[in-house]
Every structure is written in C-alpha cells, then in structure tokens.
Amino acid sequence: LDMLIKTLRMENFRQFRGTTKVDFSCDPDKNVTIILGDNTFGKTTLLQAFNWCFYGKVNFDQRPDFLLNYELSEEMRNGEQQIVEVEITVLHDGTEYIITRTQRYNCTNGNVRGESVPTIKVSYKQEDGQTESVKATQVDNVINNILPEDLSTYFFFDTERVSSISSRRDVAEAVK
C-alpha cells in the first residue's frame, strides 16, 4: 500500500468553523504525523473527517447526521445556505488524488437541514500537470484502491483504540 496523505482541509466540519487545513509530513524519513491536544479539542473529529471524506461515514455520539458547525447553523437565516466540505490530498502509487466530499445545508422556516445526499468528487493530476476528474461511476473503486475501507481502522485511530488492535491476524484478515 503506497499512500501518503499530503493535506486535509475542512470547511465548517463540526467544531471546525470556517476553513481548517492540516499539512502532513511528506518527508520520506519522517512520514508520521502525530496530533496532540487536550480532550474535546477535535482530535477525534479529525479522524471522523477522514472517514467521512473517504467513505461517507461518521461515528459521532451526538447528532451524527448533522455535520455543520453548530454555531454557524444557529446564525443561519431563512433562505441561507452553508456547506460542510472535507478535502483530502493524497499521493497513491505516484499519482496525486484530491478527494472532496461536500454536504449543503439550507435554512427553511428556521430549520437547518442537510440536503439528502452529500456529493463526492475525485480528481487526479496527470503526468503533464493537468487535473482530470474521475467518473462518478468509478469514484468508489478509486477510493477503495487508495485505501480499502476495511483497512482504514489501521490507518486512522485514536490512542484509546491502540489497545484494541489485538493481533497481526486481525490485520491479515482485513488485508484479505
């Protein structure tokens, strides 16, 4: 699995209001990025952003279907629209991919609701530097080629889960 995450960009994702960008280490000798912080400051939300961007899934205890920043949603007026967006730039087998998942939220009669289905786009840079979009029918295949969902738990985990990775057999099963 030859994958290197370059950047994570979040727009209004849960407690991250506005644009938040994280640049990850791409140094071949120092390619591990550790995110430290106090409890409730967003480390787990960063992991959830990866899962949502790649697979459209989150695992939040409170309001798991509502990803828009709460403060921003409280300020919305009738007819206004806001977006939640997560974009990941990743190098996979020498090709740079940009994966972007977007959810629009509308305020109608004082209620803020997300549109029924988030959109996902995947593009990649060709050797000549031009960006090409992946066909919608191939998006899931491309994402699973970059990082199969079954393996994602071994790449994106918080320290509380380290002890739950019980054996190499678990990893071997996920790889199969």
Residue ranges, per PLM feature:
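A general secondary-structure signal for short beta-strands and their flanking turns/coil
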Residues: D2-M3, R17-T19, Q81-E85, E96, ...
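Pre-Walker A-like glycine/lysine-rich segment at the N-terminus of P-loop NTPase domains
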Residues: D2-W52, V175
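A generic structural motif
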Residues: E11-F13, T89-L91, E96, S123-K125
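A generic secondary-structure signal marking the coil-to-beta-strand transition
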Residues: N31, Q82, L151-T153
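Conserved P-loop NTP-binding catalytic core
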Residues: T33-L36, L47-N111
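Glycine-rich phosphate-binding loops of NTPases
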Residues: D61-D65, N69-Y70, E96-T153, S167-A174
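A short hydrophobic beta-strand->loop->alpha-helix junction that borders the nucleotide-binding pocket
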Residues: F157-R161
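Short, solvent-exposed loop/turn segments at secondary-structure junctions
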Residues: S163-I165
